[in-house]
Amino acid sequence: MSTYNKNRPQTIQIMFNSIAKQYDRTNAVLSFCLHRRWNLELVKKVQSQQTSHTLLDLCAGTGDVAFSYLNQVSAPCQAYLVDFSSEMLACAEEKAKSFGKTPHSFQYVLADVQRLPFSNQTMDCATMAYGIRNIHHPLQSLQETYRVLKPGGCLGILELTRPENKFLQIGHQLYLKTLLPLLGKWLTANENAYQYLRKSIHTFIPPGELEELVKTAGFINTGRYSLAGGIATIITGFKPMK
């Protein structure tokens, strides 16, 4: 049984710090590289068409989503990468060097997404990938995101979910219970982290309830998009103009 528990956030912080350097390689192996396609789908749904804008990437990890976003836009973008794992942000900062000369700028913010250190109505769009199921109070993080988004701003959430198809459920559960922990142990020497991952997916609310939570936080015109038969889901929503 995993010793990590989202009701004890410091244990989750320790977990992500411990696997940060192996995180990208592990994600690629465990998702069969599908996560890159999913990240791009998320980016396409929230991409701003403004000439200059701000991106708030929550639970940013090593920056995959933020950098995928910036690769898709040519207009200057100020990207704020927020995570409570200092090791994850250090990996993101190192990865950003590969951009070389770019019109974009980056800021790395060590913070809890339930208490964002930004003023009201300062961000144009926000993303959160593979993070919300790890948050102790997910509604609070959504309300904070709503607070800092400008009117008309878009939120996009990408999360690992449970497929609805019964046959897919069987294969999914088998993978999570057997192969996932073994691969996680082999790649990171931290089997506990991937036991936690299995449990967090299994116990998290279904996509429909997550969409309702986004609405409860105040977002409108929400959308829900199933990926790979439901093993991942994108939820989008907009802050009203008034």
From Swiss-Prot:
Keywords, alphabetical: Menaquinone biosynthesis, Methyltransferase, S-adenosyl-L-methionine, Transferase
Annotated residues for binding of S-adenosyl-L-methionine: T62, D83, D112, V113
Keyword S-adenosyl-L-methionine: yes
Pathway: Quinol/quinone metabolism; menaquinone biosynthesis; menaquinol from 1,4-dihydroxy-2-naphthoate: step 2/2
EC class (word): transferase
Pfam family, one: Ubie_methyltran
A GO MF label: demethylmenaquinone methyltransferase activity
Keyword Transferase: yes
Disulfide pairings: none
EC identifiers of the protein: 2.1.1.163
PROSITE patterns: SAM_MT_UBIE (PS51608), UBIE_1 (PS01183), UBIE_2 (PS01184)
Similarity-based family: Belongs to the class I-like SAM-binding methyltransferase superfamily. MenG/UbiE family.
Function: Methyltransferase required for the conversion of demethylmenaquinol (DMKH2) to menaquinol (MKH2).
Name assigned to this protein: Demethylmenaquinone methyltransferase
Gene: menG
